[in-house]
């Protein structure tokens, strides 16, 4: 999909770049698969900010995605490819032969009219979902489960994919795009192919207001704050951060400091993303 530039009628239009999506459905989404969702503004139930830089944005309705793909041995036809405001990937509306409809993450190359199916022994074909134990080594997959029947958790964003590199006993070894090598139970399901809309990272919003439409608020440097607001704040004129190491507003080291503490799953990581 090519990028489109605009006539520079304003600074925002001059800098903007959009991905051309001619095959995306222009009408309304399937009403039965929509749910309402309210904005949190990054606040928890106490009203305190727990996630910064969140607030405002256009109203959105959540599209219910079938991450489990547990409707086995029943063929489905792709009715259309749609835009989803809640994720970077596009979604595909499926219609099963029994009349049921559902949304899935749209793989790269999937188009209207294609037939897909899920099950333990289905063909290795784009969009089909099956357990890792039945997928040939070297296959590129996406929407991978971390626990059997829990639903896809890995490789769901635009352009992402995972490669099945080995299978030994009850485990399958996956190579992630980050370079991490990870073991997953071979009973976990995955979908053949990689996620579509792979040029999403090439788009340019063009102006700050476009970011606000997405519900993202500005990020203020700690050095521009007062000492009461941030450890880097204060000082005369444009002073530096003043700390020997950069920290978060709560004093936790940042910019490279490792914060992952999950010994339970560490045993499944063969090689970390940092080598």
Curated annotation (Swiss-Prot):
GO CC: one term?
large ribosomal subunit
GO: which molecular function terms?
Answer: rRNA binding; structural constituent of ribosome; transferase activity
Provide the alphabetized UniProt keywords: Ribonucleoprotein, Ribosomal protein, RNA-binding, rRNA-binding
Q: Which Pfam families match?
A: Ribosomal_L2, Ribosomal_L2_C
Keyword GTP-binding tagged: no
Q: Is Ribosomal protein there in the keyword field?
A: yes
What biological-process GO terms show up in the record?
Answer: cytoplasmic translation
Region (Disordered) spans which residues?
227-261
Functional summary from the UniProt entry: One of the primary rRNA binding proteins. Required for association of the 30S and 50S subunits to form the 70S ribosome, for tRNA binding and peptide bond formation. It has been suggested to have peptidyltransferase activity; this is somewhat controversial. Makes several contacts with the 16S rRNA in the 70S ribosome.
Return the similarity comment. Answer: Belongs to the universal ribosomal protein uL2 family.
Spell out the NCBIfam families in the cross-references.
rplB_bact
Tell me how this protein assembles: Part of the 50S ribosomal subunit. Forms a bridge to the 30S subunit in the 70S ribosome.
Q: What is this protein called?
A: Large ribosomal subunit protein uL2
Name the encoding gene, please: rplB
């Amino acid at each position: 999909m090519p990028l489109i530039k605009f006539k520079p009628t304003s600074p925002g239009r001059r800098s903007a770049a959009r991905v051309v999506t001619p095959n995306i459905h222009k009408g309304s989404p399937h009403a039965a698969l929509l749910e309402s969702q309210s904005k949190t503004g990054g606040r928890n139930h106490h009203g305190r900010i727990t996630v910064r830089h969140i607030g405002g944005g256009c109203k959105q309705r959540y599209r219910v995605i079938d991450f489990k793909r547990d409707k086995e041995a029943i063929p489905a036809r792709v009715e259309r490819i749609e835009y989803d405001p809640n994720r970077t990937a596009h979604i595909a509306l499926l219609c099963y032969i029994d009349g049921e409809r559902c949304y899935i993450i749209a793989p790269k190359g999937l188009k209207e009219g294609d037939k897909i199916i899920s099950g333990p022994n289905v063909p290795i074909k784009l969009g089909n979902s099956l357990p890792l134990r039945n997928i040939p080594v070297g296959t590129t997959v996406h929407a991978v489960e971390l626990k059997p029947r829990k639903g896809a958790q890995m490789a769901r964003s635009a352009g992402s994919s995972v490669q099945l590199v080995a299978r030994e006993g009850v485990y399958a070894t996956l190579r992630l795009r980050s370079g991490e090598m990870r073991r997953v139970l071979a009973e976990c399901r995955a979908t053949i192919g990689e996620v579509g809309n792979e040029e999403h990272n090439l788009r340019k919003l063009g102006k700050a207001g476009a970011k606000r439409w997405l519900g993202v608020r500005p990020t203020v440097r700690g050095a521009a704050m007062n000492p009461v607001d941030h450890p880097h704040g204060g000082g005369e004129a444009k002073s530096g951060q003043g700390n020997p190491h950069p920290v978060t507003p709560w004093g936790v080291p940042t910019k490279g400091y490792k914060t992952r503490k999950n010994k339970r799953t560490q045993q499944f990581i063969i090689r970390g993303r940092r080598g």
